[in-house]
Amino acid sequence: MSKGLFITGTDTDIGKTYVTALIVKTLRKSGYDAGYYKAAISGAPTVAASDAGFVNKFADINEPEDMILSYLYQHAVSPHLAAQMEGNPVELPVVEKAWKRVTEKFPYVVMEGSGGIACPIRRDEKAKIDLTDIIRMLKLPVLVIADAGLGTINHVVTTIEYTRARGIPVKGVILNNWKGCLLYTSPSPRDRSVS
């Protein structure tokens, strides 16, 4: 049985792909046979030019494109809108089959989400699928990637509460884009008056 981890973020462009690539590369360099999978990507002309292509190359996985990604959309909008525009909606059985194939090959698999945890994946007359539906279907725990900046506490708490409210375990949080010390070190006016 394969061990899996789902990477989500508090927002889009938060560093999920970068952190995912580092995790997979570190696992592989440490002797763990780790793979990667992403259900849907929007805003990329080809798999090679996408987040999945970056992780595949950076982490030295070198898997065929159909092993790392199920749905590629060229429009740079959320997957549910891109699917409506391009006519190729995400199907849960396709994602489940692809996940099974990846987990049969790799004992450790890191799956990267699209956008944030509440990202809609499909919205049409046949189905309403959110990212959390995929995570629950695959029974994966989540690792949250957040930007180490103003507003982070709220974004992290909101993401964790939303995830847990859907019965999905959260394994941890990684603060990305950290610049310097997170502790406020300048004394307050009150502290400056004390001798």
Feature locations, PLM:
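Inter-motif core of Ras-like GTPase G domains
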Residues: A127-D147
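Conserved small/polar residues in nucleotide/adenosyl-binding loops
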Residues: Y184-D191
